[in-house]
Amino acid sequence: MFESLKNFVKTNIEDLDGKELEISKEFKEHHNKDSKYIIKNWIFESQQYRKWRITKLDGGDKLQVFNTVAYPNFKSEFPILGADILWFGTSQKLLAIFDYQPLIQEKKYLQKYCSSLDFIKNQYSVFDNHKMKNIYDSKKYFSPWVMICRGNKLNLDRDLNNIFCSFVSNYLTINKLHQNNQFLDLEQIKNNQIDYDKYSAEKDPADKLFKTFFGETWTENFINNFLFTLNHNPLK
């Protein structure tokens, strides 16, 4: 599941003359003890994005997970793209969160880089779930227009692909239109991306999920050396 989403990201990175990077075997594909859960990962980079990662978790009919995060290079104050999608097969429930995660909460910054999410939300009302805003910290690395969906099989089949593609395409377009920094210098950008990784490594809700399936040792290594590498290694 979600192969089309992965391929869409990959194609767009290739259009930017980006490339897929080699990653260690332990992260490229990892199975839990009884192989009921399989996690696969990819990393890409381009001139515009120093790291664009994808994670897919295959739990068969019970659970399917897709996550992608794009880090602009340190010369760009552009937000970090973040998308989490979970499909719970037993209950037939979809949970998805999409956002252009801002490096700062300055009003003019948010308006310039993140406000176009509102246009996408207006097209897909199912992704405008105000009841779930307690699941994130609005004062940290989330925009006022974060898109949240708690949906069903119909939303999975009918809406998800279209809204994900709009979300990614819009992000790429905005980045092309705004090449000049207005709010942050290089050192501030780097420090904010480091803080983002530290914050995310501590707060990531997938931590418990991964520990349940793959154990604490592997999960800690995965979080610090694949997902959020700036948490403990500021130069990576």
UniProtKB/Swiss-Prot annotation:
Q: Name one Pfam family in it.
A: Fe_bilin_red
Q: Which UniProt keywords apply?
A: Oxidoreductase
Q: Which reaction does it catalyse?
A: 15,16-dihydrobiliverdin + oxidized 2[4Fe-4S]-[ferredoxin] = biliverdin IXalpha + reduced 2[4Fe-4S]-[ferredoxin] + 2 H(+)
Q: What sort of enzyme, by top EC class, is this?
A: oxidoreductase
EC numbers = 1.3.7.2
**GO molecular function, a single term:** cobalt ion binding
List this protein's GO terms for biological process.
Answer: phytochromobilin biosynthetic process
Q: Which HAMAP family match?
A: PebA
Q: Name the PANTHER family on file.
A: PHYTOCHROMOBILIN:FERREDOXIN OXIDOREDUCTASE, CHLOROPLASTIC
Q: Which NCBIfam families match?
A: PRK13246.1 (NF009719)
Q: Its biological function? A: Catalyzes the two-electron reduction of biliverdin IX-alpha at the C15 methine bridge.
The family note in this entry says:
Belongs to the HY2 family.
Q: What is this protein called?
A: 15,16-dihydrobiliverdin:ferredoxin oxidoreductase
What is the originating organism of this protein?
A: Prochlorococcus marinus subsp. pastoris (strain CCMP1986 / NIES-2087 / MED4)
**What is the name of the gene encoding this protein?**
pebA
